[in-house]
From Swiss-Prot:
<keyword id="KW-0393">Immunoglobulin domain</keyword>
<keyword id="KW-1280">Immunoglobulin</keyword>
<feature type="modified residue" description="Pyrrolidone carboxylic acid">
    <location>
        <position position="20"/>
    </location>
</feature>
<dbReference type="GO" id="GO:0005576">
    <property type="term" value="C:extracellular region"/>
</dbReference>
<dbReference type="InterPro" id="IPR036179">
    <property type="entry name" value="Ig-like_dom_sf"/>
</dbReference>
<dbReference type="InterPro" id="IPR013106">
    <property type="entry name" value="Ig_V-set"/>
</dbReference>
<keyword id="KW-0873">Pyrrolidone carboxylic acid</keyword>
<feature type="region of interest" description="Framework-3">
    <location>
        <begin position="79"/>
        <end position="116"/>
    </location>
</feature>
<keyword id="KW-1003">Cell membrane</keyword>
<keyword id="KW-0391">Immunity</keyword>
<feature type="region of interest" description="Complementarity-determining-3">
    <location>
        <begin position="117"/>
        <end position="119"/>
    </location>
</feature>
<dbReference type="GO" id="GO:0006955">
    <property type="term" value="P:immune response"/>
</dbReference>
<dbReference type="GO" id="GO:0003823">
    <property type="term" value="F:antigen binding"/>
</dbReference>
<comment type="function">
    <text>V region of the variable domain of immunoglobulin heavy chains that participates in the antigen recognition. Immunoglobulins, also known as antibodies, are membrane-bound or secreted glycoproteins produced by B lymphocytes. In the recognition phase of humoral immunity, the membrane-bound immunoglobulins serve as receptors which, upon binding of a specific antigen, trigger the clonal expansion and differentiation of B lymphocytes into immunoglobulins-secreting plasma cells.</text>
</comment>
<keyword id="KW-0472">Membrane</keyword>
<keyword id="KW-0964">Secreted</keyword>
<dbReference type="Pfam" id="PF07686">
    <property type="entry name" value="V-set"/>
</dbReference>
Length: 119
């Protein structure tokens, strides 16, 4: 009976609920001061062409809180952190399921772990 109930429950769940969303960040581990950092977020399990979908970049300096950097949405609208907007560019390639963040004029204070996230 338990197996039957589980099977029936699975059959009533929309297929999109069962899809697995993954995001993977890639880029250099280190950049020198004044260089440009380019990070790529490759994702699966959703489409950035779908209305309401967004991808953000955030970072976390060692021992500090998360800091939001930038967001791009399905309609190619772009939003940036006020304090960093002159140094950041976010773009997307929906054919490759990728969002790219570039950050110019890197400085030691930019030392952090950088993450992308679906919003």
């Amino acid at each position: 009976m338990d197996i039957l109930c589980s099977t029936l429950l699975l059959l009533t769940v929309p297929s999109w609920v069962l899809s697995q969303v993954t995001l993977r960040e890639s880029g250099p581990a280190l950049v020198k001061p004044t260089q440009t950092l380019t990070l790529t977020c490759t994702f699966s399990g959703f489409s950035l062409s779908t209305s309401g979908m967004c991808v953000s970049w955030i970072r976390q300096p060692p021992g500090k809180a998360l800091e939001w950097l930038a967001l791009i949405d399905w309609d190619d609208d772009k939003y940036y952190s006020t304090s960093l907007k002159t140094r950041l560019t976010i773009s997307k390639d929906t054919s490759k399921n990728q969002v790219v963040l570039t950050m110019t004029n890197m400085d030691p204070v930019d030392t952090a772990t950088y993450y992308c996230a679906r919003i």
